[in-house]
């Protein structure tokens, strides 16, 4: 499987056994000005996340592109 991986958000071939791509988003102290933090990568199973963290998992090549946010002005 190929997934987008941060920090560069480039498409990379996942290690053997890691067939899930994920997009994890959450707010930090700069959320109001910069938007959510985003973490992209490969995993063997969809990662468990803490409350307040959104996770989306998928299993096709490059199915986790860097999200495009509508910027607040």
Swiss-Prot record:
InterPro entries per the UniProt record, alphabetical: Snake_3FTx, Snake_toxin-like_sf, Snake_toxin_con_site, Toxin_cobra-type
Keyword Secreted applies: yes
Protein name: Long neurotoxin 2
Protein's cellular compartments: Secreted
Cystine residue pairs: 3-21, 14-42, 27-31, 46-57, 58-63
One GO CC term, this protein: extracellular region
Family named by the database record: Belongs to the three-finger toxin family. Long-chain subfamily. Type II alpha-neurotoxin sub-subfamily.
GO MF, one annotated term: acetylcholine receptor inhibitor activity
Function according to Swiss-Prot or TrEMBL: Binds with high affinity to muscular (alpha-1/CHRNA1) and neuronal (alpha-7/CHRNA7) nicotinic acetylcholine receptor (nAChR) and inhibits acetylcholine from binding to the receptor, thereby impairing neuromuscular and neuronal transmission.
Pfam families, per the entry: Toxin_cobra-type
